[in-house]
């Protein structure tokens, strides 16, 4: 088997040539990791052994004080001028310096990056035929020629140089101005070349190499700790990051263990067992203040045939939602705020209804701490408003057919189309305008009339959460990524923050026991009622298939049989949000509220034109590439023709209402959704 490795030919061109080879670095990091793991285990063991054993996640909480000092940074300490920030479209602000109890300092800038779907293809060859997946063959004409950095809308995966130069551009221009990176997966080529089928080992190798590139690019080279990064990185698992694509079994498995090894420098050590089970974790982006949860969306994904739903207690999606619930409650108890992230967006097109509805409930009932969510997979820049109140209604109706809920309510034609898309994995866009028009009709238009009735502070805005879906690096359209700006003004007023909570390793130790206990009790209860439930379901299935009317009657009967408070006994459903909790950062401008964003893109057609011109002028390949390749501002959230005051939920709901009724605005929105590539169906 051909061993995959980062190509040597053009490494020096990226500005990252000072890195050691991936294999040497891997051995070095493994040795260091073993030492660090041993020391961490020793320290953790002493803490646990001296602590009282807990019977639940919140009883007899152990005190663990961690102190942080916050101070503003003077203008002469700023790493970049206001003029430079303005040229990048960013808002100058006053960074905040955090000093922990050990004296370690970190500067908080109030910005972060969302990047997704790079799909680097090490078999990509410049000047080959696009029709032959950019792997081989002589181009039939200039339109069939594989460009060095890729061709928008042509269907090939990303050239390695596109990934290298993208990260290098971010490193040179933005790495000193962001606090963390949300990286939502798909780091491996598609399985779209029958002559070079993907293998499991190749997928592991590619995930490792891309992870190492992120580590090298954003490492804190002033620190002696190999785990220290200039910015924190929160990766998520993509449906093409596994073998075979889309298929991901309940953990622990070889894949979850191998992925933990690959991402061990991104994942807090206390969460290793959690990752082994769910391939999910979270990171404190700002210690004690702001967290980012990485969800393994493959356990909820319709395209994964190894999982079914989030209703059956044996399903990994159900178990992962238990983890989500306990984790969110702990973050709320600690007074923290949180972003969610994952690869596949949690919408009905992608998720089983029991999964998308339940996740919508958590977004809604924990809206005092959840700011929103970032996802990839779709390759298009757009947003989906998720209605939490509607999710409660959908769940109540679907429970009538127990674990068959959602199955018979699905649009079978839509599922057939989705299945066809899954089989034909690739980068070429197909019927994307049709999809976006569906988003407009299904989401934006349906809320338009309600929005017109709302007052400035109407609580109905709080029924919605926003799912942000990012542009990809792979040239499905033009490559793009986004920088978000968020509120840090209140950090400047806090002299000290004292946290008294159980250590995270203690929390997760007891959480594992708690979840296992819940699962065992639920499975025992199901076994007792299994025979009766099977008879009930068997009698309902023919009615459902014959008539929707009969199905609804069947649902009504089953619902009457159950307690009206059935959701209170199932911990994958959240408790109602206490009425005394104020609106969170997604709804009112406060600490960590998202204020605006800047969308960057690479105009591949113009880059290739400039690159070829420079070659003709006598420049070397590396010189021409360094000059030609660049990202530029595509637009900012406050740009015309639909400038947003902020990027709170209210602003998105009002934008959705505007887009539903204004075709001219919609045309601009579509142009931006397709990253200024000129795409049309």
Swiss-Prot record:
Cofactor: a divalent metal cation
Disordered: region residues: 549-585
Principal subcellular localisation of the protein: membrane
Biased composition, class Basic residues, residue ranges: 549-562
Keyword Hydrolase: yes
GO terms for MF: endopolyphosphatase activity; exopolyphosphatase activity; phosphoric diester hydrolase activity
Keywords: Glycoprotein, Hydrolase, Membrane, Signal-anchor, Transmembrane, Transmembrane helix, Vacuole
Post-translational modifications reported in the UniProt record: Processing by proteases in the vacuole may be required for activation.
Topological region Vacuolar: 45-681
Protein name: Endopolyphosphatase
């Amino acid at each position: 088997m051909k061993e995959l490795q980062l190509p040597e030919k053009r490494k020096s061109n990226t500005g990252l040539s000072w890195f050691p080879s991936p294999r040497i670095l891997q051995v070095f990091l493994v040795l260091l990791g073993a030492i660090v793991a041993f020391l961490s285990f020793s320290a953790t063991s002493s803490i646990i052994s001296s602590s009282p054993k807990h019977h639940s996640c919140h009883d007899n909480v152990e005190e663990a004080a961690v102190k942080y000092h916050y101070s503003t940074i003077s203008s002469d300490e700023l790493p970049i001028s206001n003029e430079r920030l303005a040229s990048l479209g960013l808002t100058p602000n006053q960074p905040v310096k955090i000093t922990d109890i050990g004296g370690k300092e970190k500067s908080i800038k109030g910005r972060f990056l969302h990047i997704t779907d790079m799909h680097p293809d090490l078999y990509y060859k410049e000047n080959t035929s696009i029709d032959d997946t950019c792997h081989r063959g002589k181009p039939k004409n200039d339109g069939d020629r594989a460009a060095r950095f890729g061709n928008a809308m042509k269907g090939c995966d990303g050239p390695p140089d596109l990934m290298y130069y993208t990260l290098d551009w971010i490193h040179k221009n933005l790495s000193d101005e962001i606090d963390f990176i949300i990286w939502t997966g798909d780091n491996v080529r598609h399985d779209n070349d029958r002559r070079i089928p993907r293998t499991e080992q190749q997928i592991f190798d590619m995930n490792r190499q891309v992870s190492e590139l992120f580590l090298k690019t954003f490492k804190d080279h002033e620190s002696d700790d190999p785990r220290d990064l200039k910015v924190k990185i929160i990766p998520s698992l993509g449906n093409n990051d596994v073998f075979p694509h889309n298929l991901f079994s309940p953990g622990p498995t070889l894949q979850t263990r191998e992925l933990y090894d690959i991402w061990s420098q991104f994942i807090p050590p206390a969460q290793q067992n959690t990752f082994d089970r769910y391939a999910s974790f979270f990171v404190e982006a700002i210690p004690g203040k702001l967290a980012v949860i990485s969800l393994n969306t493959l356990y909820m994904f319709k395209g994964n045939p190894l999982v079914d739903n989030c209703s059956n207690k044996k399903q990994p999606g159900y178990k992962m939602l238990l983890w989500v619930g306990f984790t969110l409650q702990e973050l709320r108890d600690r007074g923290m705020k949180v972003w969610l992230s994952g690869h596949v967006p949690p919408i009905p097109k992608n998720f089983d209804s029991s999964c998308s509805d339940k996740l919508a409930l958590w977004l809604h009932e924990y809206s005092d701490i959840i700011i929103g969510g970032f996802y990839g997979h779709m390759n298009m820049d757009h947003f989906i408003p998720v209605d939490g109140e509607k999710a409660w209604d959908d769940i109540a109706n679907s429970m009538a057919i127990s674990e068959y809920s959602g199955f018979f309510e699905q649009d079978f034609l839509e599922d057939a189309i989705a299945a066809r898309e899954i089989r034909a994995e690739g980068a070429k866009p197909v019927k994307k305008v049709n999809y976006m028009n569906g988003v407009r009709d299904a989401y934006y238009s349906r809320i338009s009339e309600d929005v017109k009735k709302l007052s400035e502070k109407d609580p109905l805005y709080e029924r919605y959460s926003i799912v942000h879906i990012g542009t990809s690096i792979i040239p499905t359209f033009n490559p793009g990524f986004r920088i978000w700006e968020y509120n840090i003004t209140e950090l400047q007023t806090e002299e000290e923050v004292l946290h008294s909570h159980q250590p995270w390793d203690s929390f997760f130790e007891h959480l594992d026991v708690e979840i296992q206990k819940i699962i065992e009790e639920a499975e025992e209860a199901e076994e007792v009622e299994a025979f009766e439930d099977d008879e009930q379901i068997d009698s309902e299935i023919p009615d459902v298939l014959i008539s929707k009317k009969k199905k609804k009657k069947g649902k009504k009967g089953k619902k009457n049989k159950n307690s009206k408070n059935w959701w209170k006994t199932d911990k994958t459903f959240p408790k109602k949000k206490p009425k005394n909790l104020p609106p969170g950062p997604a709804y009112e401008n406060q600490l960590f509220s998202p204020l605006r964003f800047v969308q960057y893109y690479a105009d591949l057609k113009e880059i290739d034109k400039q690159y070829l011109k420079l070659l003709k002028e006598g420049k070397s390949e590396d010189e021409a590439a360094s000059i030609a390749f660049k990202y530029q501002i595509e637009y900012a959230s406050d740009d015309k023709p639909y400038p947003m005051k902020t990027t709170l939920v209210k602003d998105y709901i009002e934008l959705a209402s505007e887009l539903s009724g204004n075709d001219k605005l919609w045309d601009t929105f579509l142009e931006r959704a397709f990253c200024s590539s000129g795409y049309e169906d």
